[in-house]
């Protein structure tokens, strides 16, 4: 994976420099959609075929996203296809997303919950977490029933675990010590 990260970095940085201020988040959505499409092994096998022209691969990938791509993102896709780097596109999307977040002072937060969280409750939770972590957060929720209750929040390399499962583990350690 380090090789893909090394290959992806110049593409992500060049795209970030090319993105107009205020439009980078929209570009990130388009690149993420392209990355999801490029992650498909059948598509990559098709793209690697010497019988397929670069324009055919471009048309297929751009068509599957069902979005009108801005010229800068189109140029990225063309360059990656022509250079045989389509397999690095998911990593380019991840690195570009990280650059956009870093420039806007936002961090990604993954909230693991045993149960679905209502939008209003999530907004309150995010406001509390932003105070706790000292930065703006972009939260996504993933269900994890084995937590029993509560939440576990991961922001970068920081973890806040207030789940029932974690509390039971702490009690187990305390009782067996």
From Swiss-Prot:
It is found in: Cell inner membrane. Keywords: ATP synthesis, Cell inner membrane, Cell membrane, CF(1), Hydrogen ion transport, Ion transport, Membrane, Transport. Its main location: membrane. InterPro entries: ATP_synth_OSCP/delta_N_sf, ATPase_OSCP/dsu. The keyword Transmembrane does not apply. It is a peripheral membrane protein. One of its GO terms (molecular function) is proton-transporting ATP synthase activity, rotational mechanism. GO terms for cellular component: plasma membrane; proton-transporting ATP synthase complex. F-type ATPases have 2 components, F(1) - the catalytic core - and F(0) - the membrane proton channel. F(1) has five subunits: alpha(3), beta(3), gamma(1), delta(1), epsilon(1). CF(0) has four main subunits: a(1), b(1), b'(1) and c(10-14). The alpha and beta chains form an alternating ring which encloses part of the gamma chain. F(1) is attached to F(0) by a central stalk formed by the gamma and epsilon chains, while a peripheral stalk is formed by the delta, b and b' chains. PANTHER family: ATP SYNTHASE DELTA CHAIN (PTHR11910). Belongs to the ATPase delta chain family. F(1)F(0) ATP synthase produces ATP from ADP in the presence of a proton or sodium gradient. F-type ATPases consist of two structural domains, F(1) containing the extramembraneous catalytic core and F(0) containing the membrane proton channel, linked together by a central stalk and a peripheral stalk. During catalysis, ATP synthesis in the catalytic domain of F(1) is coupled via a rotary mechanism of the central stalk subunits to proton translocation. NCBIfam families: ATP_synt_delta, PRK05758.2-2. This is ATP synthase subunit delta.
